[in-house]
């Protein structure tokens, strides 16, 4: 078992054992416990009653966080012809066609999101082993294969993010930075909750939400009361 630092152990003592916190109480506590010298990311970890080995229990979609993620997104676009100018004028940081595909083959990965037009996907398929493990492979489900570059680029720049369950049926989602005020973090968290409920897979049976915890990058995990979260509870 990994040994906890004295700093982390001290923070952990400030979380009441067996208590399920209201969303706002948890967010306030998370911010108050932060004592590092950089701006931490706020993360939520949600255990769902899904078994991802079944096709009808997969959960992968996108959501637009109203208050953004707090992260400056570097967006790359693979396209060609007249779409190249469209991508550049819409704010893409990197734009290319076959030339960019070749650069990625050689190791270029200085971007956070890769968007592509459908006509480039056959060429991009050869990058699967490079992009797949890093979660950068464009796909229609992730909203990153599109003809509508203008809207897609602007949305990802503004705070749109993709989330999907891991092999254990757990979601791990960043929903802001600790320099956000509590109200803005709460709005983003509720937006995530509504998206997860709205996109419940058809094959989901029994209890859908099993547990919810939030934490900052270097902070301890704080358990949330699921019902208060799903009722859009405001103290």
From Swiss-Prot:
Gene Ontology MF terms: rRNA binding; structural constituent of ribosome
Superkingdom of the organism of origin: Eukaryota
S-S bonds: none
Compartments it resides in: Plastid, Chloroplast
CDD domains hit by this protein: Ribosomal_L1
One of the GO BP terms on file: translation
Chief subcellular location: plastid
SUPFAM superfamilies: Ribosomal protein L1
Gene Ontology cellular component list: chloroplast; large ribosomal subunit
UniProtKB keywords: Chloroplast, Plastid, Ribonucleoprotein, Ribosomal protein, RNA-binding, rRNA-binding
Family: Belongs to the universal ribosomal protein uL1 family.
PANTHER family assigned to the protein according to its UniProt record, in alphabetical order: 54S RIBOSOMAL PROTEIN L1, MITOCHONDRIAL, LARGE RIBOSOMAL SUBUNIT PROTEIN UL1M
Quaternary structure annotation from Swiss-Prot or TrEMBL: Part of the 50S ribosomal subunit.
NCBIfam families linked to this entry: rplA_bact
Function: Binds directly to 23S rRNA. Might be involved in E site tRNA release (Potential).
The name this protein goes by in its record: Large ribosomal subunit protein uL1c
Origin species: Gracilaria tenuistipitata var. liui (Red alga)
């Amino acid at each position: 078992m990994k040994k906890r630092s004295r700093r982390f152990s001290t923070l952990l003592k400030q979380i009441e054992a067996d208590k399920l916190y209201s969303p706002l109480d948890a967010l306030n506590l998370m911010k108050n416990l932060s004592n590092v010298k950089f701006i931490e990311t706020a993360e939520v970890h949600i255990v769902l009653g899904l078994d991802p080995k079944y096709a009808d229990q997969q959960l992968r979609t996108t959501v637009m966080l109203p208050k953004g993620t707090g992260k400056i997104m570097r967006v790359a676009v693979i396209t060609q012809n007249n779409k190249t100018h469209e991508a550049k004028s819409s704010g893409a940081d990197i734009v290319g066609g076959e030339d960019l595909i070749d650069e990625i083959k050689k190791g270029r990965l200085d971007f956070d999101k890769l968007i592509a037009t459908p006509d480039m996907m056959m060429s991009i398929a050869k990058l699967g082993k490079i992009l797949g493990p890093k979660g950068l492979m464009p796909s229609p489900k992730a909203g990153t294969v599109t003809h509508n570059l203008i809207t897609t680029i602007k949305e990802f720049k503004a705070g749109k993010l993709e989330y999907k369950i891991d092999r254990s049926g757990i979601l791990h989602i960043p929903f802001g930075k600790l320099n956000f005020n509590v109200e803005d973090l709460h709005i983003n968290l509720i937006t995530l909750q509504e998206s997860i409920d709205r996109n419940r897979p058809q094959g989901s049976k029994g209890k859908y939400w099993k547990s919810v915890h939030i934490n900052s990058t270097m902070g301890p995990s704080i358990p949330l009361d699921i019902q208060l979260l799903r009722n859009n509870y405001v103290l």
